[in-house]
């Protein structure tokens, strides 16, 4: 896809260049578009600009469904189950992504060179962000994370580190696994058992300061909307080290504000 030269496509290209995102790599975008929409940015045109910049690589967006796919409603449909993480991710899922991982709570939509590889095995794990998930598969790729209008509190990749280092702290035990059915776009149905994340007050934003101090995280603004960007390798390296020192390092201290 080649985007028309629009305000949004030019802004997307400038943003990704300033964020240090390689056009032939993998980009995970987490976004809140409200401020950009308020100043006239069109979400569809912005997505097309992102896709054009990443035309030799892969664009991925989390398409969470944990609020609606539950033990009381245990069906996930790759094409039909709507996400609840904002307009950009939902438009991308519906109109641009060629692949979506099969997962009842933490699916990922993707477009580009490695979209199939990134999303192929999510349903083979028994946790939301296992090695078989896009977050785990992305560790083998040149992956960057961009947080637009939000901060690390919305960065799903951090859950991957939790699951790898201290699953007993952050996940329900194996005996509490739930049963779900995932329908792929070809109509095939894949049953899976899932251990959900425990509801804990996590302090993901604490990792921004050390990453920034070491020159590993970039910051900026796009039309008044703040952004942060970091390579997934650097991000997970910081968090793996923290969890290996203290498996409860991510949990906010008593009395800390609750991050919704």
Give the role of each language-model region.
Residues 30, 159-160:
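Histidine-centered active-site/metal-ligand motif
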Residues 44-46, 161-166:
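Short, solvent-exposed amphipathic alpha-helical segments in soluble enzyme
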Residues 70-159:
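Internal, conserved structured core segments that host functional sites
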Residues 165-192:
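Gly/Ser/Thr-rich active-site loops/lids in small-molecule metabolic enzymes
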Residues 14-20:
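Short amphipathic alpha-helix with an adjacent loop that forms part of the alpha/beta core around
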Residues 6-14:
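N-terminal basic/disordered segments at the start of proteins
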Residues 20-72:
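N-terminal active-site beta-alpha-beta segment that forms phosphate/nucleotide-binding
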Residues 191-260:
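Acidic/aromatic/glycine-rich contiguous surface patches that form carbohydrate-binding/processing clefts
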